[in-house]
Structures are given as C-alpha cells and as structure tokens.
Design a protein with these regions (language model features):
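C-terminal ends of transmembrane helices
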Residues: 50-65, 108-124, 170-178
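Hydrophobic residues within membrane-embedded alpha-helical segments of Major Facilitator Superfamily
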Residues: 14, 38, 45-46, 52-53, ...
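Internal transmembrane alpha-helix with an interfacial aromatic "cap," most often the third helix
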Residues: 61, 73-95, 108-119
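Alpha-helical membrane segments in multi-pass integral membrane proteins
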Residues: 124-142, 149-171
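Short, small-residue-biased leader/transition segments that mark boundaries at the very start
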Residues: 2-13
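Helix-coil boundary and interhelical linker segments in multi-pass alpha-helical membrane proteins
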Residues: 17-36, 82-99, 139-155, 199-209
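Small-residue-rich segments of transmembrane alpha-helices in multi-pass membrane proteins
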Residues: 14-16, 69-83, 126-140, 187-199
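Interfacial loop-to-transmembrane junctions
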Residues: 172-195
Length: 209
C-alpha cells in the first residue's frame, strides 16, 4: 500500500502539472482564470482524495471512514468544478450563473449528506451523482448552438462516460467482479471516471478557453 500511495500521489502530481496548461492559456482573463482554477483544483482534489483513501493502511477504522467520506465528497466537488467554466464562460448571464449556483448548491448538500450518511446505498449515491451531472439538460439546446459540434461532442462524451461508470458502480454486477480477484466493478468505475476527466480536460483546453 505504501508503494501504491507513492505511485498514486505521483499520478496526482502529474495531473496537477497537466492542469497547468489550462491556467497558462487562461492567463490574462480574470473570468477564465477563475473558472479554470476551480476546474483544475476540483480535479486535483478528487484524485488526491481517492489516491489517499485507496492507499492508506495501518490506521483506525474511524480514520479510514473519514477518508472515505472525503473521497465521496470530492466527487460532488469535481462535478461542480466541471460545470464552473461552462456556466461562467460558455453560458454566462443569468442562465449560466443560475445553473452555477444550483450545481454548487447540490454539491454542498451532497457533501453534507456524505458527512452524515456515508453508509448510504451505492445506488442512492450514484443517482445523486448522475442527476447532478445532467442538471444541464434544460440548456442542452443553447450549448449545442453556442459550441462547435466537436466541442459539444467532447462535453457529451465526458458526461456519458461518467454516467456509465456511475451505473457500474451502483449495480456492482457479479459479471465484473468475477473476472479478476483485484479488478472488479469498483476499479472499472475508476477507469470510467478517468476517461470522463480526459474528455472534459480536452473540451476545456481546446474549446472553452
């Protein structure tokens, strides 16, 4: 586990470096800089929390549970962080900032729920994550109009990949867990999360800034 921790934190460090081009490209525009800082920070926090929780050992059950809470809470932060540049830069105005307030409000509520009820069923957590992720459905037409089709494709692909991962996480189907002793639905879920992050990073870097 110590080796996994070292490798995992190294991966987080690489992600932090990978996020820096967003900030470099956004430099000079205060709105872009703020939005991209929030997005990049949310991504780093999610992967840092996940790495620590899945790597720590020789700690009490209470400490482990607290890190589990942090891991789950950061999912809400990443979702809201991913919405931030879309709301502030692409949508803007009353619609953009209303949606921004809504998703961050859901994030705060989700963090409170996880803090008080970490043992809630996986399907319940997944429903909240997925519903929050698709809060943008009412503005889909505007996004399709305002964005190049390739940009909309990357944005949509990220959402779909995240959603598939969430469904796999919730269902925990035996077919996934029977394939390998140390690689099951939970690990597949993490792969889909990384895939969604890559899609949204490409979207942010090439089309939002």
């Amino acid at each position: 586990r110590d080796l996994r921790m070292s490798r995992g934190l190294g991966d987080v460090y690489k992600r932090q470096i990978a996020a820096s081009p967003l900030l470099i490209k956004a430099h000079g525009n205060a709105t872009y800089m703020l939005a991209m800082t929030i997005f990049a920070t949310s991504m780093v926090l999610l992967y840092a929390a996940s790495t620590i929780y899945h790597s720590i050992c020789h700690v009490s059950a209470k400490v482990l549970r607290n890190f589990q809470k942090l891991d789950h809470m950061m999912i809400f932060v990443l979702i809201a962080g991913s919405y931030t540049p879309v709301c502030m830069i692409i949508l803007g105005g009353r619609i953009g900032y209303t949606l921004l307030a809504l998703v961050w409000g859901i994030a705060v509520a989700g963090i409170i729920i996880k803090g008080l009820w970490i043992t809630c069923p996986k399907w319940f957590s997944s429903i909240i994550y997925i519903a929050m992720g698709w809060t943008c459905l009412p503005v889909f037409t505007q996004l399709w109009t305002d964005l190049p089709h390739a940009a909309f494709g990357w944005l949509l692909a990220g959402g779909i990949i995240y959603t598939i991962g969430g469904v796999i996480y919730a269902l925990k189907l035996p077919v996934f867990n029977a394939l390998h002793k140390y690689f099951g639905s939970h690990e597949i879920f993490h792969l889909f999360v990384m895939g969604g992050s890559v899609c949204h990073f490409i979207f942010m870097y090439h089309y939002v800034i």
